[in-house]
């Protein structure tokens, strides 16, 4: 098992090269954070760090480490919801070692997602279940003044993109990032 990425990150390295053809989600996440111009933000993320193995860096994303670095510097809060205690333990470990605060919610995100956040990152299950969950989660926060990110469009956002089009809600597609692209929805302008 290869844990070299986690070890490098914990060692303070920031420019860590990964051998993969997958375009990491990081630029899209940073693009969204940049929209807040260094202001404190509250973030709700569905899904913690699956594994500290390097191969999970591009499939699982590790987005809470990017969000965490932002709130460490500019303030705000990060809540991560996951049904898997091991995933939350990984997220907790990284936050403790990298020095940012995190709120952990064990259970289905639909039970804890609320309208109190500036950014929502809906990154739950893949496949039919994930597609349905993503749509349900979005409907629960649809009337917020927030930015919503969803990755793995082909497995998590098929129903959501149809819903957005039917409601004439604009969204931006980032095809070359993550596994199958990402979308961002800026609900602050609606």
Report residues per predicted region.
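Class I SAM-dependent methyltransferase Rossmann-like catalytic core
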Residues: 1-40
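Surface-exposed cleft-lining segments at the edges of enzyme active sites
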Residues: 11-19, 51-56, 122
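Soluble or luminal CAZymes and related metallo-dependent hydrolases
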Residues: 20-28, 59, 63, 86, ...
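SAM cofactor-binding core of SAM-dependent methyltransferases
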Residues: 27-109
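Short, solvent-exposed loop/turn segments at secondary-structure junctions
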Residues: 48-51, 85-87, 125-127, 154-155, ...
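Short catalytic/ligand-binding loop motif for oxyanion handling, primarily in non-cytosolic enzymes
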Residues: 51-54, 87-90, 112-113, 129-130, ...
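Active-site segment flanking the S-adenosylmethionine/decSAM binding pocket
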Residues: 105-161
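A short, conserved beta-to-alpha structural element at the edge of catalytic cores
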Residues: 149-190
């Amino acid at each position: 098992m290869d844990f070299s990425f986690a070890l490098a990150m914990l060692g303070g390295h920031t420019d860590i090269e990964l051998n993969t053809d997958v375009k990491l989600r990081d630029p899209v996440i940073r693009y969204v954070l940049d929209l807040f111009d260094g202001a404190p933000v509250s973030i709700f993320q569905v899904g913690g760090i699956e594994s500290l193995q390097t191969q999970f860096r591009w499939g699982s994303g590790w987005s809470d480490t990017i969000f965490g670095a932002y709130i460490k510097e500019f303030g705000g809060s990060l809540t991560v919801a996951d049904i898997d205690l091991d995933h939350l333990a990984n997220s907790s470990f990284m936050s403790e070692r990298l020095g940012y605060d995190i709120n952990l919610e064990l259970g289905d995100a639909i039970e804890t997602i609320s309208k109190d956040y500036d950014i929502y990152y809906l990154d739950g299950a893949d496949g039919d279940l994930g597609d349905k969950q993503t749509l349900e989660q979005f409907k629960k926060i649809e009337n917020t003044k927030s930015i919503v990110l969803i990755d793995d469009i082909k497995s998590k956002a098929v129903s959501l993109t149809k819903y957005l089009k039917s409601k004439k809600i604009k969204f931006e597609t980032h095809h070359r990032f993550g596994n199958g692209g990402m979308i961002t929805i800026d609900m602050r302008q609606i």
